Structure formats: C-alpha cells, structure tokens
Amino acid sequence: MKVAIVGVSGAVGQEFLRVLDERNFPMDELVLFGSKRSAGTTYTFRGKQIEVKLLQHNDDFKGVDIAFTSAGAGTSKEFEKTITKYGAVMIDNSSAFRMDADVPLVVPEVNAADALERPRGVIANPNCTTIQMVVALKAIEQLSHIKTVHVSTYQAASGAGAAAMDELYEQYRQVLANEPVTVEKFAYQLAFNLIPQIDVFTENGYTKEEMKMYNETRKIMHSDVKVSATCVRVPALRAHSESIWVETERPISVEEACEAFAKGEGLVLQDNPAEKEYPMPLFLAGKDPVYVGRIRKDLTNENGLTFWIVGDQIKKGAALNAVQIAEYLIKVKNV
C-alpha cells in the first residue's frame, strides 16, 4: 500500500501524519507533496525522514493507492486528474468536489458505502461542522426520521488555520498588555469577542459555511431534512461545539436519545447535569469521538429534542474522517 499526503505542511496535513501513525494505518510507503514553499522540508514518520516533493503535473502519483489531499480547493481542482490518472483514490479535504453529483461525500459512521461509487476516483471529506453533526444525527435518525434541524455552531479559532490560532494568542496578550490589537485573520478582534460570520455571505443572508451544513447534511444522509444554521467564531483554541435542535416524525424521549447516543458509532455520551458533566472544547481537543451532552426535550414542540456536541475539527472534522474512509475501503477490499 502506497499512500500520499498532499499539503502535508498545513494543520490538517500534520494531523494526517499523526492519525496514520496512531491508527497503525497499513502502508509500505508514504510520499509527501507540497508547494514550492514546503518542498524540500523533511518530516519524520515511523522513524524515517521523508522529504516533501514539489506537487506538479507529472507521473509522481504512479503506484499511489490512496492520496489524502488538503491543500485547498483550487489545488484539488487543478491536480485532480494528475492524482487519479493512474488509479489512486483521492480523498479530498477541501470544498472543491463536495456537491458534485459524481463525487461521494462520506462520513463513515453514516454513509460509508457511498465511497464505493466514485466514477472520478475522488471521495470528498465534508466540512468539519457537518461531520460532527451528522455523526450525532445518525443516532437519532435511526429512532425516527429527522424533519428539521436548527444548529448554532461555536467554532474555535484554529478552524481558520494555524495562523489564526496564533493571532488569537497574540490578541489576548495585546489586550492584557493594553497594546493595539492586531486584526488580520478575522474580520474583527476575536479575543474577548464572538464573530457571527464564518465565510462570506450569500444572497439569502446565510454564510457559505451555514449553507454547507444545509447542503452537505442532505447529501450525506440521503434525506430531505431541512437545516438552518448559524455559524459563530468563538475565542476557543481547538474543537468546535454545536447546539442542535431536531424535530422528528415521532416524539423521542430523553432516555431513548441517551441510549441511542451511548450506542452510536463514533459518539461518546457525556451527560450528567447533576455533576456538571457535559462536553467542553477545553478538555476534548485532540480526541477522536464526537461527544454529546445536555440532552433534553424541547419545551415548545413535543417532537423536538435539543442537545450539545463537541468534536475536534482538525481530527474527526478533517484528517481522522478521511483516514476512516480509507480504512473502510481497505476493509471491503475496494482499493
């Protein structure tokens, strides 16, 4: 098994290295690709030094079985055919192909089998906020069809990249030192603040991030579910949180929901209000599962249920999900 990582120097690329090692992913060879800026850099993987190759239109992907790509939508679109022309399965972390009809959009806990139908040799990784939400929604959907979802996200600074996380650190330092605050990666100062905008606004008043949650959820779950999202950047460092309200076709009790979440693949139930036990990003950065808590019946709709989830957006929201897709393909001997 020969594996490639495209965009290895970024936050998700680095997480790919960690996840592949942690999970003892089966491979005989790992090749790394990057831009002119990162080409020539070396990374250690399983005791070996691997030099980053310059990504270019040549035959470097000949013999590659699986290519994990996380170098941005533009790069993915430009290099799709170069990466796949010799048969490599391209598992792409960007937004480039997610809504293409001939590209499966996969969260293994929800729709793993979709990965088997990939006419272009490409499988898309969903947006981080969508991934953790649909893992939780799957548990409820198995009890009763979900008709409507209202979700508010609380997205950590690192979701905007490593430089954004560094800027948040610096902003806190500047505020506490009574210095002018540097604002480059966000629309406004994030330290001691919330910003109710992630990505650009569309004509309907929702941001692109919010519309991703609508469109991607319906594609992944093969569902007519209606999703209304509000995405907010918060001054946490890592791990995204979401407050989710669902309306199901029949009433779901808290006990039923808790049992479903406890048994749900990729989920950890952390719901003990009496002991103040509930998921928080401070304690869940770097963890694999999606954590669920604050489960309660809606007071205005007998078919409504409300809960709170937290997941690491770089791990399950990106690298881990992609690696799990590859593991599934290996398991069913489809790569």
Model-identified regions with their sequence ranges:
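N-terminal Rossmann-like NAD(P) cofactor-binding subdomain of oxidoreductases
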Residues: 1-190, 226, 290-291, 295-300, ...
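Charged docking surfaces used in two-component/phosphorelay signaling
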Residues: 67, 157-335
